[in-house]
Amino acid sequence: MMPSQITRSSHSSLPEVAPASGDAAGVSEQTPQQARTVAFFASGELAVAFGRTSTAPAQDSVRLLSALQRELDKQQPSWPTVAQLCHSLAEVAKTEQGWHQLASEDQAPAPALKDLLERCIGRLADMPASHASHDSLSLACEGLRTARLHQSVARLTARPPALARAIPDLLALTHLDPETLGAEPPVVSSYTLFSHFVHTAKQRTAELNDSLQRQPEAVVSLLRSHADTLNDLETLPGALQALTENCQDAPACNELRELAEVVGALLQLLREHGILPRLEAISIEPGEAPAPGHEAAEPRLTRSQALLKAGGNLVRKFDAYGALAPMDDKGLLALMRTPAPHLSPDQMHAFLNKHVLHLTQEQRDIVSNTPLPFAPEGDIEARCGMGFDEKLRLALANGSLVLSEEQLARLGHLPSAATTTSDVVKTLLEKPSSALSEAERDMLGAIVQANGQGQLDAWRAHNEQLPAVLSRSGLPSDVKDELLSLNQSMNAELGTLKNGASFKSRILASPAMLLALAPLPLAVAFVSKDNSYSSSLVAHFTKNAVFMAGLMMNELTNARTNVDHGLNRYFVTVLANAIVAQPTFARNEHLLEQVGFGIATAVASGAATLGVFNRESIVAAFKLAKSKLSRQDTGNASIPEEDHLAVVRHFDVSEHFAQQMKVATELYKQDKSITDIMNSSLTYLGTKSSEFQARFESVDALRAGLQLAEGERKADPDFYTKLGLVALTASIGAALVMLMKSMVGKADYAADGVWCVSEMLKLAMNPEVDMQKAVQVFKEIVGLNLVMTGFLGVNKVWNFLDKGIKGYASGAAVLTAANLTLPGMVGEVAGAAAGKGLSYLTDKGKAAHQAGRAAASWAGNYVGTSRLGSAVGTLQTAIPGRIAGGQVVAGLYDRFRYLTGSHPTPAQQAAGEP
């Protein structure tokens, strides 16, 4: 239950501070801070936390300020006198009348307290610690700081804008004694008023944050005038943590945790507006511990250290580093391999609740004691579900767990992607890793854990049910075999992720390919005496050797990985050289230099390459043509509705696994890196899962005699950058063919260029492929072409490759080094730049279309407008992730919304629920 709503008394109406309980001796042993804390708990009043009383002041603050200024103006001030005046001023500031006088100081003929404080602080900084008056001046500064604190609090509570009143509440919490909260009753008998105070402070802070974001001018102007006092807020995170650790009341602890979250946002906003110093500007003396809530600023680097750090960051971009260096695969693999949960959407929701709901200990006990029902053999979700979260869901369902109004309100504010303005999700997606707060990192980790933990076992167990599911589907046998084949390929990849690949496939396959396939192309190149071509092959196969080492080291190198490596790194080169091997070794230069022979070689090589790399698409096209030309068995059109729902649900859950895995991977890569091999494995799973789902939907609609509705294309935030890589690949291929001297080289690189463009285009059109996978393939198949273009362009001017063995060796070494370092880095940058250009041109094209359509409509040319609109509609369908205004919609938003439960389950869809 929430504490009853208690209306605060006015800050100017203050009760006398009296001991809450205990005998006189107990009270006398209390420190002033402890006494203020006890009194604050008894009253819940802001002024009591600062020790303010209603006692009439013994002196007038205006006279004290004037006397202090006169003393400071003397050539030799009496520092004991200054200390006494400052102490008296601090005592006056604690009275109600003193508050009002200091709050209206600018209207009185008195010197400014802030200026006097700055003068004393400056004098103290210049005075050696061994000086006889150092202690007196230090006490004077302490008294002035106390008076200045009370003045700022008085002004912030008495003047508009009212939103600034959150600051006094927060400052009050820094003046409490945390250990008093842990004292046994009767010292502290109730947390009700304290909990309400913190709750109000949280609301006011949230309003202040909103004001600083929307209309900051007035608030910033007021707060900046009290920046010296607001520096005390730097200690607030540590104070809140200490209060939470000592607090014995669960609702109050929850309020303190929530307040800590909004306080973190406030401190960041105050730094952005220059009211508080940025973290990097906060210096810490040697040997001094950083203040609570502060992160120690990184020490300034020397020039050599900065160059070394920049060099390290550059090396991490090199292709060879990515092939050989260990990444963070083990962390993500360990999470996925842990035999814990597959989370259904409801369980996912519950998991996030645990991270933001902050259950009390009593509520946690209720959840822990909730029994889990027996899970049938076929219920994969129940058998693999996370225990605590499943219990939480059941406890809520059976009514044993009752949430407070505040907790229920939090449920309504869970991170959601219903709109792209969702603060939590937007922060996780857009902030760089270094800028994430601790709470944001916790949420990011929670989402990764919820989507990744235990997925491998659960997904494989789910896939093993497919034969039994298909027996109820009514689909023809050939379709069942096709679906089982796709299912088997996914399970094989899941098995590699779970257990690693066999030692044999890792150690033997890639070295065998290098030893068996490299000699022929190298021999042809050297015999043909085309130095530019042979040097490119030296660079090519040297990089293959580096990639070979990376494949041997990585535990995920399975048969599919080796096949992809062989096709991407060897096939085109070996094929082109095999065609020209006989005339080359026979010294038939006449044939080799004929244009017709070169064209025939390029066509044959290109056709074979396209056929091999598009073999699955070609087979699918033949099957489609066969089905249209002959009557095919569509299966049983009449199967029980219960069976149909079970089959549909199985395929939906399978796609749900794939989406969860992708979410976990994308968010994991926000903060860490994974190898290209692991990323390729996860991309393969996502692609096969999409094929699996699409194939079932098409054949199931055909079985039922229904027209399959055209589904929405998945959003792809990397589409334009991948398309930029396609344009870059095409331009590189064309330039390289022009630079090659021999027809053998021209034929090889012409076929290679066509193949590279087709492969990069397939990646661009596949929404399951992210930019890392696209850059990986670019490095493998286009990387050498990229560096060769520049290299041969330079050689065309100086011709160093033909100037003896020394010139050739130097050129080959430079080309090899460039091939091992530059392609991925250059491709990523160039692809992003080209992608931005394509996106810009698309937006301009849409704007031109809209203007043309308006003009055509005005002229009455409705037919032309309709055709134009249809063409643009087709274009928009072909370009994924676009909405009105040219904004790219990040695909993760939709997936996150699916996982947080707003996506209907198959059962809800069947029942017609929203």
From Swiss-Prot:
Compartments, record wording: Secreted
Disulphide bonds in the chain: none
Region (Disordered) location: 1-31
A GO CC annotation given for this chain: extracellular region
Record flagged with keyword Secreted: yes
Record carries keyword Secreted: yes
Composition bias, Polar residues: 1-13
InterPro entries: T3SS_HopW1-1/HolPsyAE
Keywords from the named record: Secreted
Superkingdom, natural source: Bacteria
Family listed: Belongs to the HopW family.
Protein name from the UniProt record: Effector protein hopAE1
Organism field: Pseudomonas syringae pv. syringae (strain B728a)
Designated gene of the protein: hopAE1
